[in-house]
UniProtKB/Swiss-Prot annotation:
GO terms for biological process: DNA integration; DNA repair; DNA replication; DNA transposition; latency-replication decision; viral DNA genome replication. Residues 656-663 are annotated as: Interaction with and host ClpX. This is DDE-recombinase A. Residues 491-605 are annotated as: Target DNA capture and bending. It comes from Escherichia phage Mu (Bacteriophage Mu). Homotetramer. Part of the transpososome complex composed of a DDE-recombinase A tetramer synapsing the ends of the viral genome and the enhancer element. Interacts with target DNA activator B; this interaction brings DDE-recombinase A to the transposition target site. Interacts with host ClpX; this interaction remodels the transpososome for replication and is required for the flaps endonuclease activity of DDE-recombinase A. Keywords: DNA excision, DNA integration, DNA recombination, DNA replication, DNA-binding, Early protein, Host cytoplasm, Hydrolase, Latency-replication decision, Ligase, Magnesium, Metal-binding, Nuclease, Transposable element, Transposition, Viral DNA replication. The keyword Metal-binding applies. Its main location: host cell. Mg(2+) binds at D269, D336, E392. Residues 77-174 are annotated as: 1-beta, viral genome ends binding. GO terms for molecular function: DNA binding; double-stranded DNA endonuclease activity; ligase activity; metal ion binding; transposase activity. Residues 249-490 are annotated as: Catalytic. Residues 1-69 form the HTH Mu-type domain.
Length: 663
């Protein structure tokens, strides 16, 4: 068999130059047999007969091509063929994935040295020479290189990197189960994986006691702890911390709000302040404030403070929001499904309300009457999923606690977030409610005005106020009607109305603790004895709104505030109102009463005395003398008197007998 090779294929063979030009020069000088290669366009390509090459070069060329020349001809060198089932590639590369960075770097260091040694051996260089040459070039041990080379020979070349990974690290992490009796292992994990979260040291102490009792074979504490660390993390969290903590192992969803409009979606929640406040009724409490926040811009839109989270603070703060900013066409609200927030007065009629018994005839709640769509935060393992509401972040580190609870005006009243974090001046003072509410308003304003907010819409530059002002200008809203505003006010129980048109309202026990008298002249003529009153507890000395028991609006009533005994101006105002009432009443009488009493008398018909009726019974006349008639008349009178005495005596006897029987 004749073998023809190009000058490039001959380059770098033993005894030949390293370049094609050098090979051509040697070939011309030594007179190698050559020919022009066919099929080459645009020039001539020369190739040489392999028999013209020096013996060393020819042997290396044949070895490179997998052949060898003998006296009996050319033989193809047999190489081991690797079948797919010889080894598990996935398991091999899994070892690579589980290796440490240092193990992978070490494998990558040995890979080029092993590849170089393999190429030199394929070119016919002796094993000793090849390993020594490569080891000297890469500055590694020749014997170690030889071990690495034979280590990868049973794998395909693309898998050599994974095959070179040192498995000693993995072996150190594997604990032989033969050291640990299965019963002992089950005892340990049953003790360790409990909601009480016992310390591992104490679990191991109990394991040692049980092992001595039952003759179990157990490893050292460090080995057992490594075995515990190999347990599935999700399983450990679920058993020791609960389902709620397990759900937190899933990364939080990243949501965008860019597609929303300002005021299109709001969310609310209550925040318990860490401040002692002397409330309006004299009690020292930690008040709770309900906040409404715009989801897109994160601005706090409205709030109301109370002794607890209740329907009053929620509906009044909602009234503040819609009164100031209006109601968008596509309106959404997200709140927790708590007893205070998800009550029927606010959310009744919502199809997805899972609080209290839902009835088909439930009246629509105020949120739905305002055109809002209700959304509830999730409940996981009996606990709320707070990360679903952006307003929760306003209560976190650097939030409203820093702006309000730790304000210098409230120094000495701060309680700390928990009993373990009480300040040294804990309980020094309790601030008045007026001061606290003023500080709360200032803190919310500072919270909204701080620039450089790291939110999607602020971009690390703007404040919540800046973004809301920009986005709100592009939002279409409708202002609530007066009737809608009155619907959001607090409804009082039915109160009695006096004939003067005044009534007493005992309201605001939780918000103000007030008792006021209200009046409107229209109530005198409303024809009702009781009215239902709607009011704002923070405006009790202003106007309240009166409704009939079936919900029809009657009028507004103003508060009759007490005045000083020597207040002449108030006296003049009272006399002016008396004159006004007198004049208005006279005008009403004049308009209503259009005839006087004389005119009424003239219109009455003349009534004549009726004639005596005629008797239709005729008696028999028996004449007698006058003397006899008088005598008989006297006898009759005596008889009548005596008969009456007997009758009265008989009645007395009967009454006495009746009483005896009754006794």
């Amino acid at each position: 068999m004749e073998l023809w090779v190009s000058p490039k294929e001959c380059a770098n063979l033993p005894g030949l130059p390293k370049t094609s030009a050098g090979v051509i020069y040697v070939a011309k000088k030594q007179g190698w047999q050559n020919r022009t290669r066919a099929g080459v366009k645009g020039g001539k390509a020369i190739e040489y007969n392999a028999n013209s090459l020096p013996v060393e070069a020819k042997a290396a060329l044949l070895l490179r091509q997998g052949e060898i020349e003998t006296s009996l001809g050319y033989f193809e060198i047999a190489r081991p063929t690797l079948e797919a089932h010889d080894y598990d590639r996935e398991a091999l590369w899994s070892k690579w994935d589980n290796a440490s960075d240092s193990q992978r770097r070490l494998a990558e260091k040995w890979l080029p040295a092993v590849q170089a040694a393999d190429e030199m051996l394929n070119q016919g260089i002796s094993t000793k020479t090849a390993f020594a040459t490569v080891a000297g070039h890469y500055q590694v041990s020749a014997s170690t290189l030889r071990d690495k080379y034979y280590q990868v020979q049973k794998f395909a070349k693309p898998d050599w990197a994974a095959a070179l990974v040192d498995g000693r690290g993995a072996s150190r992490r594997n604990v032989h189960k033969s050291e640990f009796d299965e019963d002992a292992w089950q005892f340990l994990i049953a003790d360790y994986l409990r909601p009480e979260k016992p310390a591992f040291r104490k679990c191991y102490e109990r394991l040692e006691l049980a092992a001595r009792e039952h003759g179990w074979s157990i490893p050292s504490r460090a080995t057992a702890f490594r075995r515990i660390q190999q347990l599935d993390e999700a399983m450990v969290v679920a058993c020791r911390e609960g389902e709620h903590a397990l759900m937190h192992l899933i990364p939080a969803q990243q949501r965008t709000v860019e597609h929303l409009d300002a005021m299109q979606w709001i969310n609310g929640d209550g925040y318990l302040h860490n401040v002692f406040v002397r409330w309006f009724n004299g009690d020292v409490i930690r008040p709770k404030t309900w906040f409404w926040q715009d989801v897109k811009t994160r601005k706090i839109l409205g709030w109301r403070c109370d002794v607890s989270e209740n329907i009053d603070s929620i509906r009044l703060s909602f009234m503040d929001v819609v009164t100031r900013y209006g109601i968008p066409e596509d309106f959404h609200i997200t709140i927790d499904n708590t007893r205070g927030a998800a009550n029927k007065w606010l959310t009744g009629g919502a199809p997805n309300r899972y609080r209290f018994k839902v009835k088909e005839d439930d009246p629509k709640g105020l949120f739905l009457l305002m055109g809002a769509k209700m959304h509830w935060t999730s409940v996981v393992a009996g606990k709320g999923w707070g990360q679903a509401k952006p307003v929760e972040r306003a209560f976190g580190v650097g939030g409203l606690e820093e702006y309000v609870d730790k304000h210098p005006a409230l120094a000495g009243a701060y309680t700390g977030p928990n009993p373990q974090a009480k300040p040294d001046n804990y309980g020094d003072r309790a601030v008045d409610a007026e001061l606290f509410l003023k500080t709360l308003a200032e803190g919310v304003a500072m919270f909204n005005a701080r620039t450089g907010r790291e939110t999607e819409m602020c971009g690390g530059k703007l404040s919540f106020d800046d973004v809301f002002e920009r986005e709100y200008a592009r939002t279409i809203v409708r202002k609530p009607t007066e009737e809608q505003k009155r619907m959001l006010l607090l409804p009082a129980e039915a109160v009695n109305v006096s004939r003067k048109g005044e009534f007493t309202l005992k309201v605001g026990g939780s918000l103000k603790g007030a008792k006021n008298v209200y009046y409107n002249m229209a109530l005198m003529n409303a024809g009702v004895k009781k009215v239902v009153v709607r009011f704002d507890p923070q405006q009790l000395h202003s106007t309240v709104y009166c409704y009939t028991l079936d919900g029809r609006f009657i009028c507004e009533a103003e508060c009759l505030a007490p005045v000083a005994f020597n207040d002449a101006a108030a006296g003049r105002e009272y006399r002016r109102r008396q004159k006004q009432l007198k004049s208005a009443t006279k005008a009403a009488i004049k308009a209503q009463k259009q005839m006087d009493a004389l005119e009424v008398a003239e219109l009455l018909p003349q009534i004549a005395e009726p004639a005596a009726p005629e008797s239709r019974i005729v008696g028999i006349f028996r004449p007698s003398g006058n003397t006899e008639r008088v005598k008989n008349q006297e006898r009759d009178d005596e008889y009548e008197t005596e008969r009456d005495e007997y009758l009265n005596h008989s009645l007395d006897i009967l009454e006495q007998n009746r009483r005896k029987k009754a006794i």
